[in-house]
UniProtKB/Swiss-Prot annotation:
Name of this protein: THO complex subunit 5 homolog
Superkingdom of source: Eukaryota
GO cellular component, one term: cytoplasm
Biased amino acid composition, Acidic residues: 305-318
PANTHER family: FMS INTERACTING PROTEIN, THO COMPLEX SUBUNIT 5 HOMOLOG
Region (Tandem RWD domains): 246-698
Transmembrane segments: none
Coiled coil location: 80-246
Chief site of localization: nucleus
KW Coiled coil (keyword) present: yes
Biological processes annotated in GO: cell differentiation; mRNA export from nucleus; mRNA processing; RNA splicing
Length: 698
């Protein structure tokens, strides 16, 4: 074996020499010939039989290799011939395996070629399909365009078929043809439409001729009426004493309307709509115009060019050289004043109530901000902001009783706050004003509302101004319809707000003296004898209210805001003291007050640790509709306080007696109750039943 390998080794590694290359070329040619012959042979041979031959050859090789291994393992020299014989047989089998391998590769190549050809055909068919689909889509689009095509005659509104056949002459309608052919029917209807339009054109010319004649007559009458003006003026002057005597100030109203011509558009819209509403629906509504007409006229006059003499110009130059330049702060102050400048004219509205109490409203217009404000109700116009503002002032027929806790009820800052939900009047409703504020260093308009008035949203709507939030606009035109749609509801809300605040003002005066006023109409809501009494009623700031531990739930629920009014009531009976923190919504009495309770008796008891305290809060906060009393419900607050005194009596009298303490019970039971407690929470009977006079559970 070693000698044979040494002889074969040079043939394997030798790579140079001409004869070898020649031999290699000849072998390659023979191999190509065999390749082509075997390629043809593949079609004639059965792959399954080749597979069986492959298996048999492999088995035979395994057998021969095993025999060679066995013969070599014996180590007998006579076995060399047998080993050579089996080696030759093995080589023959290897040649067979090589041939089968070549045939398998040829079959694989043919399979791939056939697959590639089939794939090319499929791709060609797919491309043809895509082309056909594109042509179909193109044809469908063209068909859709044809179907959607609209002729000019389709835009013409033709008369109905019934009118066409009843009114059109037979020469045009031709019913014997058009009833069966839609195309001829459409043509006939178009002919009839043309005929009608020709007639209308002739009629139009006739009307134009008549119109010109009437216009000439109107001009003649206008000239005649203009000649009457001097005579009418003299008659009006002569009738002034009669007007004053009969309380019919026609001349004064005429002058006011002349003054209204100089109002800015928002104030003019407000004046017209408020006057119309007063004449039609509210005779106690008085509308007037205040301010300087001359200053208003000067706003719309173009500035006159002044030509100074040479001496004057020299003097000015000398003064300017000596004068110091204004600082940046002074310039900003001047710009702010100019920015917040009000229109010289304002509109005042006086709302009179049945008890002769008067709410004065003054409306201003901030021209630069384009919003409205209120004080006296006096309405102003800020010219540069293009907004309106208002100031308030309340005049009462009789002097009100002084009440410390009622100080904020009629103040201008809180009287009209949240007349509509969320309308605090502290921010400008015009989004464009923020850009103007940034230029002059104004952080917010709330710093100037005391001087300018409050720019409530409802004030802008009364002036016909609407500012869209999504598209800020520097200039907004006044809309009469917007003002008219909000006038009636706003005036009713203003009168209701004034009456409710005046009622609260009177009630607070009694509450500060420890007296809970209950009208005769509401006496049936309470028992005859109530021992608990109100000993203290004070106003508290918003910050103190939020710091109370038993008001946490109300604050977290968003029911307490800085625009609301806050009060503290103290109710006592013996050693028991009940503290009630009250949130008064600006919309009282449409929105009820909210009570938060804390009882100091044998410890501190609140709604979080005592179910009966929570039930007492429910009696005044949830069941408030029983306490409204006669409309419009201005006695709700006092009735709630009276009910608190009542339920405190029930709470204390139904509390079980402590046997460890000697002596009589501190709070003997005086109220008649069907059951003292009920349910696992041991709730007490807080509901008063009239006219039986006993207490029961809800």
């Amino acid at each position: 074996m070693s000698s044979d390998s040494k002889k074969r080794k040079p043939k394997v590694i030798r790579t140079d020499g001409g004869p070898q290359e020649g031999k290699r070329g000849k072998a390659d040619g023979e191999q190509d010939a065999r390749y082509y012959s075997e390629e043809c042979e593949v079609d004639l041979r059965d792959p399954i039989k080749d597979y069986e031959l492959y298996k048999e050859t492999c088995q035979e090789l395994q057998r021969l290799m095993a025999e060679i291994q066995e013969l070599k393992s014996r180590g007998v020299k006579d076995n060399a011939s047998e080993i050579d014989e089996r080696r030759v047989q093995s080589c023959v089998h290897f040649m067979t395996l090589k041939k089968l391998n070549r045939l398998a590769h040829i079959r694989l190549k043919k399979g791939r070629d056939q697959t590639h050809e089939a794939k090319q055909k499929v791709d060609a068919y797919h491309l043809q399909l895509q082309n056909l689909l594109y042509e179909v889509m193109h044809l469908q689009k063209e068909i859709t365009k044809c179907l959607e095509f609209k002729s000019k005659h389709e835009e013409i509104e033709l008369v109905s078929l019934e009118e066409f056949y009843s009114e059109a002459p037979t020469e045009i309608s031709r019913p014997d043809i058009t009833l069966t052919e839609p195309h001829q029917q459409t043509l006939a209807r178009l002919d009839w439409e043309l005929e009608q339009r020709k007639r209308l054109a002739e009629r139009y010319k006739e009307c134009q001729t008549i119109k010109e004649k009437i216009l000439k007559e109107i001009e003649v009458k206008k000239e005649y009426l203009s000649s009457l003006q001097p005579r009418l003026n003299s008659i009006m002057q002569a009738s002034l004493p009669v007007q004053e005597y009969l309380f019919m100030p026609f001349d004064q109203a005429h002058k006011q309307y002349e003054t209204a011509r100089h109002l800015p558009p928002p104030l003019y819209v407000l004046f017209v709509q408020a006057s119309a509403y007063g004449q039609a629906c509210d005779k106690k509504l008085v509308v007037a115009i205040e301010g300087s007409v001359e200053e208003a006229k000067a706003l719309y006059k173009p500035p006159e060019d002044s030509q100074d003499d040479e001496s004057d110009s020299d003097m000015e130059e000398e003064q300017t050289t000596k004068r110091r330049r204004p600082t940046l702060g002074v310039q900003l102050d001047d710009k702010r004043k100019e920015m917040l400048k009000r229109h010289p004219l304002s509109v005042t509205v006086d709302l009179k109530c049945k008890d002769e109490n008067v709410l004065h409203l003054t409306f201003y217009y901030l021209m630069n901000l384009n919003i409205m404000t209120v004080l006296h109700l006096t309405f102003y116009y800020l010219m540069n902001l293009n907004i309106m503002t208002v100031k308030t002032k309340v005049t009462t027929a009789a002097e009100l009783t002084t009440a410390i806790s009622a100080g904020d009820l009629l103040s201008p800052d809180s009287l009209l706050s949240c007349l509509y939900p969320g309308d605090h009047g502290k921010k400008t409703p015009n989004p464009a004003n923020q850009f103007q504020f940034d230029k002059v260093g104004i952080l917010t308009l709330s710093d100037y509302v005391t001087e300018l008035g409050h720019p409530y949203v409802w004030v802008q709507k009364l002036g016909g101004l609407h500012f869209p939030k999504d598209q800020p606009q520097h200039t907004v035109t006044a809309d009469n319809s917007l003002s008219a749609s909000h006038m009636e509801m706003t005036m009713k809300l203003l009168r209701t707000r004034l009456q409710s605040r005046l009622a609260l003002h009177k009630q607070f005066a009694s509450l500060e003296h420890g007296v809970v006023p209950v009208s005769s109409e509401c006496q049936h809501l309470f028992p005859t004898k109530i021992v608990s009494r109100l000993v203290k009623w004070t106003a508290i700031p918003f910050e103190d209210y939020t710091e109370l531990p038993y008001t946490k739930d109300v604050v977290e629920a968003g029911l307490a805001e800085d625009t609301h009014l806050y009060y503290m009531a103290l109710i006592e009976r013996g050693t028991a003291k009940l503290q009630a923190a009250v949130v008064l919504n600006p919309g009282y009495s449409a929105l009820p007050p909210i009570f938060s309770l804390c009882l100091n008796w044998k410890g501190e008891r609140t709604g979080s640790n005592d179910d009966n305290i929570r039930a007492m809060e429910s009696e005044v906060n949830v069941c408030y509709k029983e306490l409204w009393g006669p409309k419009p419900g201005y006695q709700l607050l006092t009735n709630q306080l009276q009910r608190l005194c009542m339920v405190l009596d029930v709470y204390l009298e139904t509390e079980p007696h402590d046997t460890t303490v000697e002596g009589p019970k501190e709070f003997p039971q005086e109220k008649m109750c069907l059951r003292l407690v009920r349910g696992p929470m041991r709730l007490k009977p807080f509901k008063f039943n009239y006219p039986q006079g006993f207490f029961s559970h809800r």
